[in-house]
Amino acid sequence: MEQEIKPKRPFCASCSKPMKLCICSRFKSHHHSINNSIAVTILQHSQEKNHPLNSTRIAALGLKNLQVFAVSDIHFDARFEIQLNKRSREEISDAHLERIQKNGESFDLDEEECVISATMTKFGPTFTDISHLQCNQCHFKNPNFDEVLGSRVGQDAVSNGFVVKKLQREGEELSEHEEFEISVPPGSALLYPTKKAVAVGVRVEGFGFEVKNLIVLDGTWKKAKRVHQPKAGCLSTIESIVLALKVFGEDGDGLDDLLEVFKSMIGDQVRCKDEKFRNMKSSNTNP
């Protein structure tokens, strides 16, 4: 006896929701996304994309100046290459750090690519190539991220922007493959709760620079721990983005519209769960 194959549910190509739960028409200005002056870069866990309450889909439909990059777990190891922008290299040169020892030989910084390379495993990061940090201001052994960020090279990279590339390896015998390459512009700030974080909404002046780009980690807090060192929070991705953009002076009315869409999406999920529960209860009571 052949088993009947149920047809798959149709999904919306824009919001990735089932057609009967499509949210595209719920935006008050669904023909015109908000032209946010502060860019938003979302690093989304690969398993988060199809989650029913994934709110990045709302940000993608409602904000023009936005990029989303998929980030996966590290099962074996991954190598991160950080390429400094030209301005960073010039500032290091101006600080008389042109000649740095590399494998016992001198080289001119302007003639070399200024790259910081780190390998990340399940057990944490290891800097495998920090030759550009071996200068009179960077005397440390086996540096951690805080030490690298505190160095002149690290500070210049944060101030002037950089490009980071992730090369993933799934096993010892397998070759690397590029997962992403992201350009982090000057004025970028990570929207994430840490002990050293500046509280959003307290005072904009506390950042010490003009914020032009927000970097947001999208995933459950358990998944996000693998990307950073978090402290649990309670806001969704879209709620966090809206709050931050409002603090920096973006259009409040348009941003509130995004929150209304999110609330309606939560309502859909609650109704679907209730309906599923009722159907299960009904099937169990019927003879």
Feature-to-residue mapping (PLM):
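Flanking scaffold residues of small Cys/His-coordinated metal-binding clusters
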Residues: 7, 17
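Histidine-anchored nucleotide/phosphate-binding helix
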Residues: 25, 53-62
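Short cysteine/histidine-rich metal-coordination sites, predominantly Zn2+-binding motifs
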Residues: 26-38
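Cofactor-binding loop segments of dinucleotide-utilizing enzymes, especially the Rossmann-like FAD-
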Residues: 45
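C-terminal folded domains that constitute the principal catalytic or ligand-binding module
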Residues: 207, 212-214, 219-287
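Cys/His-rich microdomains that often coordinate metals
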Residues: 19-22
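Short cysteine-rich clusters marking metal-coordination/redox-active sites
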Residues: 12-15
